[in-house]
């Protein structure tokens, strides 16, 4: 359960903090993944593709840092 404190009736900052906490908990990603049933084979393929994407991103970042 996500709790957010409201200070002095400031709803804008409270909403901003709430959205930030949801993103940290990966709530939106979980909702997107659970929207439709994904077969185990499709899940494996997706995870391999995500790992490859992360590796490319890390390699690009490392290349520009040097």
Swiss-Prot record:
<dbReference type="GO" id="GO:0003735">
    <property type="term" value="F:structural constituent of ribosome"/>
</dbReference>
<dbReference type="InterPro" id="IPR038380">
    <property type="entry name" value="Ribosomal_bS21_sf"/>
</dbReference>
<dbReference type="GO" id="GO:1990904">
    <property type="term" value="C:ribonucleoprotein complex"/>
</dbReference>
<dbReference type="GO" id="GO:0005840">
    <property type="term" value="C:ribosome"/>
</dbReference>
<protein>
    <recommendedName>
        <fullName>Small ribosomal subunit protein bS21</fullName>
    </recommendedName>
</protein>
<dbReference type="Pfam" id="PF01165">
    <property type="entry name" value="Ribosomal_S21"/>
</dbReference>
<comment type="similarity">
    <text>Belongs to the bacterial ribosomal protein bS21 family.</text>
</comment>
<keyword id="KW-0687">Ribonucleoprotein</keyword>
<dbReference type="GO" id="GO:0006412">
    <property type="term" value="P:translation"/>
</dbReference>
<dbReference type="InterPro" id="IPR001911">
    <property type="entry name" value="Ribosomal_bS21"/>
</dbReference>
<keyword id="KW-0689">Ribosomal protein</keyword>
């Amino acid at each position: 359960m996500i709790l957010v404190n409201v200070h002095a009736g400031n709803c804008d900052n409270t909403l901003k903090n709430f959205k930030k906490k949801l993103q940290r908990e990966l709530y939106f990603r979980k909702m997107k993944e659970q929207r439709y049933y994904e077969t185990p084979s499709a899940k494996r393929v997706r995870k391999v593709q995500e790992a490859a994407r992360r590796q490319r991103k890390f390699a690009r970042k490392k290349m520009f840092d040097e």
